[in-house]
Amino acid sequence: MKPRLSVALAALLLGVAATVAAQDVNIPRPADEIERELATAPFVITAAEISRPKAEGDITLKAEVSFAGAPPYRVKLRRAEPGAEDFNNRPRYDLAAYELQKLFLDPAEYVVPPTALRMMPLAELRTYSPAAKPTFKGSDDVLVVLQYWLNDVKVIADVYDPVRFAADPKYARHIGQLNILTCLIEHGDSNVGNFLISRADAGPRVFSIDNGVAFEYNESDRGQLWIRMRVDRLPEDTVERLRRISPEELQRRLGVLAQWQLQGGRWFAMPPGENLAPARGVRSADGIVQLGLRKADIDRLGRQLARLLKQVDDGKIATF
């Protein structure tokens, strides 16, 4: 190979590597690997503190957690209230947002970090969350949301910058994908801290890390900037993936998100089964607890998707 060609190829490979590194700096491991760990690996909290101590009533923990005996890393841990259905604290919504994005985004472009629902003994959680109570009858276990704690991100007043959107194609792509998700789930809480942006100088990724005020229960006194489309153009390939989402797939993927069976006073995770009560989001029968979106939620989501695609077809939202 000629020296000049070798130098050019080396530069190209270095450029690709730099792009991949920048893309992965916020979530440096494969998302599906982290997701499996959050969802299934034995875990122990080694340290934890309230995530936002100045925020009145905040119950979210910034926790250092060891999975399967490995060195601990940081996760967001939020306990459910008894019944798992409370204002701004519906764990099924957090998992639904994470799962929904999989229908139109690749893992490298996820806008919701890896998220899972777990049961843990009350005695282990009370060390860090004294007010915690059992979530469901028959066990002292507490349902918690575990979410990967993003690296190299920052909190700013608004992650959407129209000037940057017009000038930075990669940033525009990420913002457009974020806005698709928030519009579909009707995200109703634009409180500072719910949306984060990478510290990267060019093409920064953006994330929605709190999706508990959404779907039907989306009323909030902290702003609803993201409940509708804020941008006027979207990535064409992402829109084409949206077109392939069917009502049947939404029901199949979101109707039953998580399920546990009561055995010996503990809740054990099991593969999602047949929907026990499509009209309800939290279901229980014969020692089984099941969480998912209600049929009404999914039908509403389908209508949101149809409205978004109509905006594109009518030329109100362009593609690039």
Question: Where are these predicted regions, by residue range?
Answer:
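Bacterial N-terminal signal peptides that target proteins for export
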Residues: 1-9
